[in-house]
Amino acid sequence: QNEVFKSFAQNFGKSAAFAYANISNKPVLLVSHEVFGNDENEELEALATSIFALDSDGKIVTLGSIRSQGTLYPVSILDNKLMVAGHHFVSVYGIRGEGEPELEIVCHEESDMNNHSKELKALFEKFEQAKPVTFTHLLNK
């Protein structure tokens, strides 16, 4: 799978950063042009990412894109799910489907400026436990 993803990654410009992940027990390639960090080639985190997976024929399919709301909330993973957040929302994404995988929203909570629900507070606590995805400009793993 990684060789297929590596070959595919050559289609992106030099500003693209990449990460491999396992989401809902499916290998995916994450591609972002919106990364930040202290080092140009390592330890980068992303504000947004496009998600690619392999279908049952081994062909790459685009699952979609997700976006967080600032550097406090980088694209993260917890329990084999992708997570993004902002000041007033948290979204959790998984992948469903065997032959033709699809991105699915597992959970989404948001609130107005003044009132955070118990559910949203619980999701923010989960987000704090999530591990930010580490992106690199080099596909060498």
Q: Where do the model's predicted regions map?
A:
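Short, exposed beta-strand/loop patches in secreted or surface proteins that constitute
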Residues: 16-22, 52, 67-78
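Acidic/hydrophobic-patterned starts of short beta strands in beta-sheet-rich repeat architectures
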Residues: 21-35, 76-83
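Surface-exposed loop/turn elements that mediate protein-protein interactions on large endomembrane-trafficking
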Residues: 1-7, 47-65, 93-107
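Short glycine/acidic-enriched loop and turn motifs that connect beta-strands
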Residues: 35-39, 89-90
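Terminal domain-start segments
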Residues: 1-25, 118-141
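Short consensus segments that form the blades of beta-propeller domains
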Residues: 8, 37-44
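Polybasic, low-complexity, intrinsically disordered segments
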Residues: 42-45, 57, 87
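Acidic, small-residue rich beta-repeat scaffolds with periodic aromatic anchors
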Residues: 72-141
